[in-house]
């Protein structure tokens, strides 16, 4: 699992190497969920942080990975729940 640094502390990422605040690698994504997070991070870098279109793409990417019977599927559900309720900035306002 990836880690992020905060004031010298190493804090684990939410999931994999790319899922969670401050978790933008390094390292390859560990699976398809982590790939969705990497794509989301790259989208924010390109379109700006909190771009609605990036959050919508993340939700689409995670949609078929949600499965409450598996740990991995529950992670996808948790990330989806967060971003479906988060405020974002419409792309036309950037």
Predicted segment positions?
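Extended terminal accessory/targeting regions
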Residues: 1-94
């Amino acid at each position: 699992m990836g880690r992020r640094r905060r004031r010298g502390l190493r804090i684990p990422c939410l999931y994999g190497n790319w899922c969670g605040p401050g978790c933008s690698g390094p390292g390859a994504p560990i699976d398809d969920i982590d790939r969705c997070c990497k794509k989301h991070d790259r989208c924010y870098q390109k379109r700006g942080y909190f771009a609605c279109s990036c959050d919508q793409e993340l939700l689409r990417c995670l949609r078929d990975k949600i499965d409450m019977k598996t740990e991995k599927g529950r992670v996808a559900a948790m990330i989806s729940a967060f971003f479906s309720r988060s405020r974002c900035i419409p792309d036309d306002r950037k």
